[in-house]
Design a protein with these regions (language model features):
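C-terminal segment of classical bacterial N-terminal signal peptides
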Residues: 1-6
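Cysteine-centric segments in proteins
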Residues: 8-130
Length: 130
């Protein structure tokens, strides 16, 4: 049995002009970024489409006041991304902020897009993790 496929490194890149996501220099998907509301361009929302432009994933920057177990606000702000699967309406959550490359890597390294569509098995695993 060959283990060549397992040893291969996955190099994910995003072209700044076109938004094309490549894995080992092979185009896989397109990343569209837009400013998250109220963030003055600092944080972004990300849509990932297949190469034909069909929307597959939407990562939304979210902030909300943190509350304690009694429901009182602690004065801190929770910052996270809501990770939405458009077709299935599946939803995950990742704490913190994310760059365009980070959004591309989370989709590609989890094998979410296969032949231009969301892979259902990869989606199930992903939603267990996030």
């Amino acid at each position: 049995a060959s283990t060549a496929g397992f040893a291969q490194k996955m190099k994910v890149q995003v072209d700044k002009e076109s938004g094309t996501i490549t894995v080992n220099e092979v185009p896989q998907a397109i990343l569209i970024k837009e400013n998250a509301p109220g963030q003055l361009g600092i944080n972004k929302n990300f849509t990932i489409t297949n190469l034909d432009g069909k929307e597959l994933l939407y990562f939304v920057f979210t902030q909300e006041p943190e509350t304690n177990s009694r429901g009182y606000k602690t004065g801190k702000t929770l910052t996270y991304y809501t990770l939405n699967f458009i077709e299935s309406r599946g939803q995950g959550r990742r704490p913190g902020t994310m760059t365009a490359l980070g959004a591309a890597k989370i989709a590609m390294k989890n094998g979410l897009i296969v032949d231009g569509e969301i892979d259902p098995d990869a989606q199930k695993k992903f939603l267990l993790k996030y």
